[in-house]
Swiss-Prot record:
The chain crosses the membrane at residues 27-48, 63-82. Its main location: mitochondrion. It comes from Sitophilus granarius (Granary weevil). It is a multi-pass membrane protein. Keywords: Copper, Electron transport, Magnesium, Membrane, Metal-binding, Mitochondrion, Mitochondrion inner membrane, Respiratory chain, Translocase, Transmembrane, Transmembrane helix, Transport. It catalyses: 4 Fe(II)-[cytochrome c] + O2 + 8 H(+)(in) = 4 Fe(III)-[cytochrome c] + 2 H2O + 4 H(+)(out). This is Cytochrome c oxidase subunit 2. One of its GO terms (molecular function) is cytochrome-c oxidase activity.
Length: 227
């Protein structure tokens, strides 16, 4: 969950988020170096009085400023393409969760088990307990076992929604009549917050998501209690 005055990415909670943070740092390093170099060149040109009135062409410098940007783009594109393929890859999921967006709440179905489905509504401000987060707490949290490959299917019953957990680098659009999928792995036990990230009507801001990552044994006990 993003905290007050936090201007950076949220703490990583999945292997995919760790890869995305590494790519972010990689790209930012390149951008900062380019910014410093260009700024230094501009300042040096502004504050010196040297001039060259007979420069007609410069084959060498034109070659350099063509090749170097191409190399920089390749250095950014290669890890980006690798990440794009990794984000869409799902290998032998051990759990399937179907998520349905409504105006304005979420429905969850655990398709691997019988009769496990529930709705998740935001808890109104007046009904919050101590230490609950305003506009983020729900009446039914979504439990998942950590360190487990999970397949997520997202759709919508009315308008377009978007199921998003920033700390797990997951954002899936829920489109009526379509199923979008993604993989999810939590690398630690915790509670993760998210919100609908697609404007879906008057109460768009009141569709929080709470994912509770627990141990596999606790998850199995929860499944048995719901059966």
């Amino acid at each position: 969950m993003s905290t007050w005055k936090n201007l950076f990415l949220q703490d990583s909670a999945s292997p995919l988020m760790e890869l995305l943070m590494c790519f972010h740092d990689h790209a930012m390093l390149i951008l900062i170096l380019i910014t410093i170099m260009v700024s230094q060149m501009l300042l040096s040109m502004l504050f010196n009085k040297l001039s060259h009135r007979y420069l007609l062409e410069g084959q060498l410098i034109e070659t350099i400023w063509t090749i170097i940007p191409a190399i920089i783009l390749i250095l950014i594109a290669l890890p980006s393409l690798r990440l794009l393929y990794i984000l869409d890859e799902i290998n032998n999921p051990q759990l399937l969760i179907k998520i349905i967006g409504h105006q304005w709440y979420w429905s969850y179905e655990y398709s691997d088990y019988k009769n496990i489905e529930f709705d998740s509504y935001m808890i109104p401000t007046k009904e919050l307990n101590s230490f609950n987060f305003r506009l983020l707490e729900v009446d039914n949290r979504t439990p998942i076992p950590y360190k487990t490959q999970i397949r997520i299917l997202v759709t919508s019953a009315d308008v377009i929604h978007s199921w998003t957990i920033p700390s797990m680098s997951i954002k899936i659009d829920g489109t009526p009549g379509r199923l979008n999928q993604a993989n999810l792995i939590a690398n630690r036990s915790s509670i993760f917050f998210g919100q609908c990230s697609e404007i879906c009507g008057a109460n768009h801001s009141f569709m929080p998501i709470v994912l509770e990552s627990i141990t596999p044994n606790l998850f199995l006990n929860w499944v048995i209690s719901k059966a």
